[in-house]
Amino acid sequence: MTDKLATLKAALEKALGNRVQSLTESVGELTLVVKAADYLDAMRTLRDDASLKFEQLMDLCGVDYADYGDGAWNGPRFAAVSHLLSITHNWRVRVRVFAPDDDLPVVSSVTTIWNSADWFEREAFDLYGLVFEGHPDLRRILTDYGFIGHPFRKDFPVSGYVEMRYDPVQRRVVYQPVTIEPREITPRVIREDQYGGLKH
């Protein structure tokens, strides 16, 4: 671990105290895990503490840990992962919070801390079904209005449930159950004895 990362790690441990569930280093970055109950308070501390000053939320996304590590994962299924940047101190940290309930994954919204979280949280809600409590306008942002399910969940079928097509008779777009025709996906290989000037 570099001196800069060691300094950041010490500052995080001092400022957050027992709110740190785990703090690990990998590939030159620190990953901080906090409990859902401490998430909002920890994020506010990360922004406001003078020794940290993470002024900017760079990214926020959802993660589905179902079947993670070939089924070796036995923790909570859903997490929200944020990447924060301190312009003042020129360092970054990744913050992970797991939703305690797999059936209805809920974590606090950080839109009151960083307004840039707005569309990131909407995207995580749309694609993973993560509910961000306190979000001012939590609705779908990428999928269609009548879309059912959350397409980035690992239990969502790759083909989806319905397909959309234009119906010339009704003169509008219609939805219908997915129709997939079986097809040969193995390429046909033709071997020639003298291909490329090589002799066999």
Swiss-Prot record:
This is NADH-quinone oxidoreductase subunit C. InterPro entries: NADH_DH_suC, NADH_quin_OxRdtase_su_C/D-like, NADH_UbQ_OxRdtase_30kDa_su, NADH_UbQ_OxRdtase_CS. One of its GO terms (cellular component) is plasma membrane. Keywords: Cell inner membrane, Cell membrane, Membrane, NAD, Quinone, Translocase, Transport, Ubiquinone. One of its GO terms (molecular function) is NADH:ubiquinone reductase (non-electrogenic) activity. Pfam families: Complex1_30kDa (PF00329). NDH-1 shuttles electrons from NADH, via FMN and iron-sulfur (Fe-S) centers, to quinones in the respiratory chain. The immediate electron acceptor for the enzyme in this species is believed to be ubiquinone. Couples the redox reaction to proton translocation (for every two electrons transferred, four hydrogen ions are translocated across the cytoplasmic membrane), and thus conserves the redox energy in a proton gradient. Belongs to the complex I 30 kDa subunit family. It comes from Ralstonia pickettii (strain 12J).
